[in-house]
């Protein structure tokens, strides 16, 4: 994970066709966090959880 500095944009998707619009929309929370003085990080999560059980079996 990397900390995205205040005032800098970060790219979540490749900039092509519809993905560039998705990336533009996802920039809005970053601008809000910058305004509120909150940090934003991007990348893989610190803790990776994988379920050992099958959720469909658990529903029975």
From Swiss-Prot:
Enzymatic reactions: UDP-beta-L-arabinofuranose = UDP-beta-L-arabinopyranose
GO function term, MF aspect, one: UDP-arabinopyranose mutase activity
Chief location category: secreted
InterPro entries: RGP_fam
GO cellular component: cytosol; extracellular region; Golgi apparatus; plasmodesma
Aminoacyl-tRNA synthetase keyword on record: no
Keywords attached to this entry: Allergen, Cell junction, Cell wall, Cell wall biogenesis/degradation, Cellulose biosynthesis, Golgi apparatus, Isomerase, Secreted
Pfam family of the protein (one): RGP
Note: On the 2D-gel the determined pI of this protein is: 6.24, its MW is: 20 kDa.
Subunit structure: Homopentamer or homohexamer.
Similarity comment: Belongs to the RGP family.
Name this polypeptide is given: Probable UDP-arabinopyranose mutase 1
Organism annotation: Phoenix dactylifera
Lineage: Eukaryota, Viridiplantae, Streptophyta, Embryophyta, Tracheophyta
